[in-house]
Amino acid sequence: MAERSTGLPSQRQVVELLDGEFTRAGYDLEDVVIDAASRPPRITVVTDSDHGLDLDSVAELSRIASELLDGLDSAPYVLEVTSPGVDRPLTTEKHYRRARGRLAEITLTDGSVLTGRIGGVADGTVGVVVREGRSNLSVREIALNAIAKAVVQVEFSPPSPRELELAGVSRKEARA
């Protein structure tokens, strides 16, 4: 069945157009969502980096994307450049690396669920700081392929200095 033309570029076209420029700017192109049904149509570009995504970065990446996409002969659309958001599941080693020091709910492939602070990532494993009882903390090394799902949790109070230390995060990094 032939795909109906929306007058918008395809996801693949947008990725091919933007990926190299975003990489040169130090960012990973995580996803592109084309929503032709919304009015006006929307192109959402999801990007991230090891040093995060601040408003200045969003503005610069939006400018780059807009200039490149304007070169295409397409229907009008709204362009949105955004970060993946806190509810994005952690699926790759780089996602875990970027979430170091953050609290996550982790579902293992055996069905068990644990909540812990993401620590270091190396050789296909992630260190997770888990609380055992009220005050005991330990680091559990978990193979990434043993994790079915992991999602960063929103926190309303700061972690203990010991928890951050076990996760390999300095207080300065935790505040950033």
Curated annotation (Swiss-Prot):
Lineage top rank: taxon: Bacteria
One GO cellular component term: cytosol
UniProt keyword annotations, A-Z: Cytoplasm, Ribosome biogenesis
InterPro entries membership: Ribosome_maturation_RimP, RimP_C, RimP_C_sf, RimP_N, RimP_N_sf
Protein localization: Cytoplasm
Pfam families associated with the record: DUF150_C (PF17384), RimP_N (PF02576)
Coiled-coil regions listed: none
GO terms for biological process, alphabetical: ribosomal small subunit assembly; translation
SUPFAM superfamilies reported in the protein's UniProt record: YhbC-like, C-terminal domain, YhbC-like, N-terminal domain
Keyword Cytoplasm: yes
Similarity comment text for this entry: Belongs to the RimP family.
Function recorded in the entry: Required for maturation of 30S ribosomal subunits.
Protein name in UniProt: Ribosome maturation factor RimP
